[in-house]
């Protein structure tokens, strides 16, 4: 029998070799023509929203009612931008440096909200953020910086020392000592308070490690690398147990260093999670102490790509999201190109990982076009992967699905519902192109809020979803006209092609000045096959897209309006390569 470690190495090598076509100099050209058949229905699409030093939010202090409203408005504008890009997970910094952005019985307020440590802002920012994320179908994970405690003289740091916890001073800042056996239960109590008080979807642990600059393990008095890993493991396990016993659907995750350890053919160059900062992150997944990992893969080239399959091969069936160094797109921070990030997003998706941007500011400010790319990359909504091995046995499909007087309604006891629409019946709920609304917390919606309905998308299906992310079987709605409904292909919408290229100029003429940023091709049954960026030559007779990879048959063509965020069907075409020249 082959040893399990050999099988893992073989799996890693297979994945890495399959990724090679996307790693060359022209990878962006090859990888941006997204194959819509491979778009995942489930995937983490996350952003770290930093409150430390007001880096992402808030901008301005809440010392008056006007200041409170300004902070709320800023946050909702950020969340709207996330929703428009089909982001589904917000990592909201709730514990900053032994200080909080929520009212806590254990730790003081952070200064980012009012400009003063320990001063309440007059509202609960975390509760507000949770409510606003949930309105938009997004999860909110409370992001905690675990070991760092801020400047040595700061209020949070002084409070921890007053509690009797052991801290070490490094470069003027305080850090909890992981070897102090009181640290694990204390941090677990912080997470327990959060879990009990708030409807959070996850606890996200940052800096769950020995800090850079900590004295090296001397091996004296038992201070060995294994001892240090055991100290961090003790904290992780205590937090997991505190959360699991209260709300088992709350996902515990962490952001370890982006390289777990040295690989057979690729070195971590002395900086990795396991051996440098004592994060045995792959063990956390194996033991079930973590449901998700967000490795901070803030590297390029051979410092990034070989380590993707290593994480995947050792995920133990749990969820991974590649942490992206999006801030390096800012010329003041680094010299990364859009292709550096877009290749990583393509490769991590192909390997089965989601992605997370560090940090919010650089994504929504669209540095080098990264926000535009994010919108194209996330063409459809996606569900967060279901938790491994957990399910609510009471989960049942919704009932009594009705469409009356411009209102879609149904009955059920689930906390969330997913709504699918299509121009084909029954609606294929495995196809992400049909997902209209994810993680919807109500039992009715006005069709005016779902513009695809009754505009060529007459069929509806609804599934129930439990807190663990599991879906029920769909409840399908078939209008009375469904038995006779067939897509009609008006003659004036047939588009010319030669089996290799499709001419779009005629179809787009009546739509100009429509702000089109991409096209898509679908089967007549509504299954999207490929997406294309807008051709470089945006006007004139050369408005063509490559259809050489499509089989003979008849297809729909859609154009995406960047301004209105809607897909518009612009025509159909038939591929018949037995004919010569452009055909209709």
Give each language-model segment a name:
Residues 73-99, 198:
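Catalytic domains of carbohydrate-active enzymes, especially glycoside hydrolases
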Residues 189-190, 196-306, 310, 314-317:
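Active-site neighborhood of glycoside hydrolase catalytic domains
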Residues 281-282, 289-302, 321-389:
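Substrate-binding cleft of secreted/luminal carbohydrate-active enzymes
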Residues 451-471:
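Beta-strand-rich modules
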Residues 467-484:
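Extracellular fibronectin type III
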Residues 485-491, 504, 552-584:
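C-terminal tail/sorting-segment detector
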